[in-house]
Amino acid sequence: MVVKYTMSMSFFVIFASTVTIIVHGFPSTLDGPLNPVTAPLDPNLNPIAFDLPESDPSFVKPISEFLLPEQISVSLSYSFDSVWISWVTGEYQIGEKDSAPLDPNCVQSIVQYREFDVRRTRKQNATGHSIVYNQQYSSENGFMNYTSGIIHHVQLTGLKPNTLYRYQCGDPSLSAMSKEYYFRTMPKSTSENYPHRIVVAGDLGLTYNTSTVLGHILSNHPDLVVLLGGFSYADTYLANKTKLDCSSCHCDQNGTSSDCGSCYSSGETYQPRWDYWGRFMEPLTANVPTMMVAGEHEIEPQTENNLTFAAYSSRFAFPSNESGSFSPLYYSFNAGGAHFIVLNSYTLYDNSSDQYIWLESDLIKINRSETPWVVATWSLPWYSTFKGHYREAESMRIHLEDLLYNYRVDIVFNSHVDAYERSNRVYNYTLDQCGPVYITTGAGGAGKLETQHVDDPGNIPDPSQNYSCRSSGLNSTLEPVKDETCPVKQPEYSAYRESSFGFGILEVKNETHALWSWNRNQDLYYLAADVIHIVRQPEMCSVCN
């Protein structure tokens, strides 16, 4: 089913609040559980994504002053009255361990800003901090070590809710300021205030498909973007720019199978792809608050110091301190009357872990009269029926699902699986009207589309043999868990699944109703293939704390 929106369009991202969607007659979670649907694969769709060439104009550093800001992005703080502005100045370096990095103190981190429609108001100045990071390889490849340009982070505070601001970033003392950009703050957190449109996309990469996704996202004028892991895909390249061919690599994300080869053991990445990605995404990230959720491709382990997530945690700003997690891997923030919780699939989550303890404390503190909607997001999906990913994150689910269920999380977004899937409300593999709706949006442009399901004919194992239909017994942090019987048909908790590249849009209408849509690359930007009203029932599903 392809659904056309009736839209009131505008020409600029800054006027996103004027864009509306008029919808009638779509199914609702109140109608559920809905019968499982598997959308047929489009015969004209190439399921393999091809990377854009390194010569793509959007990758190239602008020919300008050395310290002029680039790779500019806006991200939210915990509440409406604060945002972060991040950017890069200078050029990265590739060389030996003892090569001198750029000095962060050689250029200031300053943002000048004011309300968009108050022309006579003096600009305000905010200052921040700057860093550089290193990505180091084994001693034999030390000549390929990467040192970033200077990465700046500035927090703006005291902002008004739902207000358009204009800003420039850089160092005015060096005449090294960016052009003017715009962002809109989130509405104040009440049961009546929500951002008009929230885009959710995962596993973007830098492919021709990513170009289409980015263009469609911009045309839909979002107020907020949530990007789930799989950004630059720098880890799919060696440090010498050689692309790793993993298309025939039949192994899980832990690299436990014998044929994984260099795809999971090289210990190398090509870090300049992070710079390409920052430039490529700037038309979106410089104007629309964008929140990042780490996934597998952001781990990037460094062989000699065991450091992980260096690029991810250095390049973006997170409301970690404001939300009390003090970690870029998991944090929370408010977007009007919606409370978002970001978790990490690749760090410890058992009940004695820092992540679990923080999650429980964050859930306890939520005021549902101010933020009725609670949305959680992380990389590995708990409820995927695609072959190779069925129950892939089982140990994480076992440790955390009760928490999310008892505190009545409404929606969960995941990525990692290069396909789209939406569940009925579910808890512990059982249909439950108080369980979350789980949505996998891991087809943002990169990788190869998953087209086989665990229940497809030929994928169902012989029950007389000792066979696991789950590709992995663990997900890189905890011990394996016992598997269950493989399904012989699409599980009833799987409401809709489709192999297509695209992204999703969440529009929260009020404290009980939200509209979700899946937008495919092969369709026009205003068309949706899967649309449903997600309805909360707080009277029936009270918080069990």
Curated annotation (Swiss-Prot):
Entry annotated with the keyword Iron: yes
Location of the protein in the cell: Secreted
Positions contributing to Fe cation binding: D203, Y233
Positions of glycan attachment: N125, N145, N209, N240, N254, N306, N321, N351, N367, N428, N466, N475, N510
First-tier enzyme category under EC: hydrolase
Catalytic reactions on record: a phosphate monoester + H2O = an alcohol + phosphate
Key words of the record: Glycoprotein, Hydrolase, Iron, Metal-binding, Secreted, Signal, Zinc
Active site: H389
Pfam families on file: Metallophos, Metallophos_C, Pur_ac_phosph_N
GO MF terms held by the record: acid phosphatase activity; metal ion binding
Disulfide-bonded cysteines: none
Binding site for Zn(2+): H416
Names of the cofactor(s): Fe cation; Zn(2+)
EC numbers, comma separated: 3.1.3.2
Co-factor note (free text): Binds 1 Fe cation per subunit.
Top-rank lineage group of the source organism: Eukaryota
Assembly and interaction partners: Homodimer.
Entry-linked PANTHER family: ACID PHOSPHATASE RELATED, PURPLE ACID PHOSPHATASE 13
Protein name as it appears in the record: Purple acid phosphatase 13
Species of origin: Arabidopsis thaliana
Name of encoding gene: PAP13
